[in-house]
């Protein structure tokens, strides 16, 4: 394989991994530990 192909595959894989981790953090099990400032502010 050429160097450009390997670089493109590694960058794409890193981007997909980061996106998956961000979605898991936002909506998965760790999301229950996040605080919601709008719920804390009572009107």
Curated annotation (Swiss-Prot):
Coiled-coil boundaries: none
- Please state what the protein is called: Protein PsbN
An example GO biological process term is: photosynthesis
Which UniProt keyword terms apply here?
Chloroplast, Membrane, Plastid, Thylakoid, Transmembrane, Transmembrane helix
By sequence similarity, the record places it as follows:
Belongs to the PsbN family.
Entry GO terms, CC: chloroplast thylakoid membrane
Give the domain of life: Eukaryota
**Which source organism does the UniProt entry give?**
Lactoris fernandeziana
What lineage is this protein's organism placed in? Eukaryota, Viridiplantae, Streptophyta, Embryophyta, Tracheophyta
According to the record, the segments passing through the membrane are 5-27
Compartments where found: Plastid, Chloroplast thylakoid membrane
Q: What does this protein do?
A: May play a role in photosystem I and II biogenesis.
Check the record and name the HAMAP family matching this protein.
Answer: PSII_PsbN
Membrane topology, as annotated, equals:
Single-pass membrane protein
A Pfam entry, by short name = PsbN
